[in-house]
């Protein structure tokens, strides 16, 4: 986009939740046109979402590879075009990480960890938005991440507050969910 005739050369990316991993993934390549990213409860890595402090969440073995991966299949002959080697090994990798703490073989999780390459390659800014009551994408995706960015000289700002897995400017949804325990 940044090199198109109609562009001023500056590109930004935004995404929320799992889609919030896309800005991180774009930033890890150090593209000169990517000036800012805005991950809203965005994933710095897929494994880091559900494995931390030596334990995993119950959804860990199947969530991304089983649940999200199944969205590409609807029972028609075009489904074969959606198959790729990573989709096939993904569920096994999730189970092996759940059982043994890491993958048995390959670099499936390393490919899906973006933060280290962002710290090494990205020259733009980051505006982190994170609900501190978010129990879907936990706040550890934003803190200490913001400090790591700043320590590496990446301009980083944050909007953190007491909301769950949602946008901070949706008060009606926030109050509706608070009756459910605010666990997002």
Give residue spans per PLM region.
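Glycine-rich nucleophile elbow surrounding the catalytic serine of serine-hydrolase chemistry
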Residues: 15-25, 136
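Conserved alpha/beta-hydrolase "acid-adjacent" motif
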Residues: 135-143
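Alpha/beta-hydrolase-fold serine-hydrolase catalytic core, especially in secreted/extracellular enzymes
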Residues: 150-184
């Amino acid at each position: 986009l940044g090199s198109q005739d109609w562009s001023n050369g500056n590109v930004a990316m935004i995404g929320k939740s799992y889609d919030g991993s896309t800005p991180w993934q774009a930033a890890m390549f150090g593209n000169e046109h990517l000036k800012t990213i805005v991950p809203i409860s965005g994933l710095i890595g897929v494994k880091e979402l559900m494995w931390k402090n030596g334990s995993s969440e119950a959804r860990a073995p199947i969530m991304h590879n089983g649940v999200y991966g199944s969205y590409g299949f609807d029972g028609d002959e075009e489904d074969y075009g959606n198959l790729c080697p990573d989709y096939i090994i993904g569920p096994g990798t999730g189970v092996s990480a759940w059982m043994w703490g890491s993958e048995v073989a390959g670099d499936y999780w390393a490919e899906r960890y973006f933060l280290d390459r962002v710290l090494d390659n990205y020259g733009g800014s980051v505006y982190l938005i994170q609900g501190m009551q978010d129990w879907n994408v936990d706040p550890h995706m934003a803190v200490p991440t913001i400090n790591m960015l700043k320590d590496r000289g990446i301009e980083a700002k944050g909007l953190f507050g007491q909301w769950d897995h949602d946008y901070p400017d949706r008060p009606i949804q926030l109050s509706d969910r608070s009756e459910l325990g605010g666990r997002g």
